Amino acid sequence: MMAHCAGCERPILDRFLLNVLDRAWHVKCVQCCECKCNLTEKCFSREGKLYCKTDFFRRFGTKCAGCSLGISPSDLVRKARNKVFHLNCFTCMVCNKQLSTGEELYIIDENKFVCKEDYISASSLKESSLNSVSSCTDRSLSPDIQDPIQDESKETDHSTSSDKETANNENEEQNSGTKRRGPRTTIKAKQLETLKAAFIATPKPTRHIREQLAQETGLNMRVIQVWFQNRRSKERRMKQLSALGARRHAFFRSPRRMRPLGGRLDESEILSSGPYSYYGDYQGDYYGSGNYDFFPHGPPSSQTQSPADSSYLQNSGPGSTPLGPLESQLSGHHPSENQRYVDMISHPDTPSPEPGMTGPLHPISGEVFTGGPSPPFSMSNNSGFSGPLPHQNLDINEATVW
């Protein structure tokens, strides 16, 4: 029976053949699938494909945790926390000194290292800078700085020295922008969505939940803890600002309801409040009989009047103000009940009052002018001026009443 090649599946007619993985091959078919070089002495196989030594370790060999490149079997390596590093990659990130076996070091973000000397010097420098900043800063005026510290006091967590390094770096970023900054952690969009969803579910996660988030996102537990502290602090600040804005809105909002421009005033509102409140206090009967219709702004001077009533006749002209009477005040008589006369200043040609022209007025019933009982008292405008009465062809001396 003729043998078939495992590579090209054709019958082998050559004088010589190669036996690889218990199968027959053409000599020319035994080659690396990556670089296409002929394999004569040794080959490596994965998933039915043949590789040379270089390409096999490049693709499937252990990779350096520092540079993410493959590690060949002949390279010298160092291990830290179940991760393998090249000798050149296993260095201090501050002084770039190559770390040797047995030396104490501090690990940051699982793949960065700081030697003991640099860590101690950096910690002492940060403590001195923090003390100088706290001595010149009023803590009572900075709630943004107090909130994360209060959270840390409530959620004290035993962490490694690398966690302390991250916390000191973040405090240094908040307090002094000119100092040397430590390594910053960049949170990707997918990681941020996971953290936000966890914050909505539990704003204060336990250590077990933080460990699960660290496994899901690949972030350090200290980074996750600080993120939750900052997020809670931000939520509190937003609530304080919203509450302060609501109080300011309630304080500056006008408590009085504004009247629409087209609305009509009620007589009770006019007589009870405002600059004409003395009308509501008057106890006399202005409008009992029809003889007072000729005096729309008040009773004749024969009745007993209060000081507010007497001042109204003096101040109710178009040329006067509510604060003071006209220069030429009106003068009235005080006759008996049957004779109500008053000397009014008038002029037949002009509505403005001019002194020196007077005429007597006789009491006339309101039915002469209106054909019925006298209407109730009402104001025509804010100044109290009601205008002249309609002229009638009567045998009396008429005058405009102000």
UniProtKB/Swiss-Prot annotation:
LIM zinc-binding domain: residues covered: 3-61, 62-125
InterPro entries per the UniProt record, alphabetical: HD, Homeobox_CS, Homeodomain-like_sf, Lhx1/5_LIM1, Lhx1/5_LIM2, LIM_Homeobox_TF, Znf_LIM
Residues covered by region (Disordered): 133-187, 291-335, 365-392
Stretches with biased composition (Basic and acidic residues): 151-167
GO BP annotations listed: neuron differentiation; regulation of transcription by RNA polymerase II
Molecular-function GO terms, alphabetical: DNA-binding transcription factor activity, RNA polymerase II-specific; RNA polymerase II transcription regulatory region sequence-specific DNA binding; transcription coregulator binding; zinc ion binding
Annotated Polar residues bias: 300-319
GO cellular component: nucleus
DNA-binding region listed in the record: 180-239
Protein name: LIM/homeobox protein Lhx5
Organism this protein belongs to: Xenopus laevis (African clawed frog)
The organism's taxonomic lineage, starting at the top: Eukaryota, Metazoa, Chordata, Craniata, Vertebrata
Gene that specifies this protein: lhx5
